[in-house]
Amino acid sequence: IKMNNKELQTLIKSQKANHTLDQKFYIDDDIFELDLKNIFSKQWVFVGHISRIPNFGDYFLFEIGKESIIIIRDKKSNIHAHYNVCRHRGSRVCLEQQGNNKLFVCPYHAWSYNLDGSIKSARLMNDDFNPDEWRLNSCNVKIFEGLIYINLSDNPVGFEDFISPTRKFIELHGLGDAKIAHRAIYPTNGNWKLTLDNFHECYHCGPAHPEYCSVHDKEYIIAYGAGGGTGPASDKFNKILNDWNVKAKKL
């Protein structure tokens, strides 16, 4: 029997404060499917930086759940996000993880698509074939400070609502003028929440990242002992953070 949203809410409400999540959140297949449906298929997701595709026709693939998304720059320098699925028989359109294409050509039956997703050619179709109805399915895409975000939902949450809590923090760094100097992929053999848990706590920072700790105030590290706001110095740290936020709004 598959777990539904109501059962998931019950499990969440039974969670003890300041404790790790129940084991089911990390190993249950149904919960993972709900994660994909309720979070990754509805929320804005960062996929890369514009400097990764600087030229006309440059593209890369981004995998999200079971979906493969083509991120590509067209001749007018607009960036598009298309599902990597031919509308004819569902074949993958792009087989390489990255590259440069001036035209998408399906390797199965040679349907071809322009970079904006419209059909260029569909061989031997009937006279009543309407190419406008068979363009590549696209998803929402937004560029903010050089960062590319996509949203798979048909009714996405407003991008401004999504980005506003971090807007000032991101704008300070001038990422729109940045370029990627190096890329590295670190596959994680585990649930995505494990990686997020590791990022959100700094209890491990002392033994695991001594150089990082050497350039931060000790109380900053302590305040993130088991996650944001859980350490004994969190009140003092939060005051400092709030003061900084006030200053950031004035910039």
Model feature map: region roles:
Residues 21-65, 69-70:
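Non-catalytic accessory segments flanking enzyme active sites
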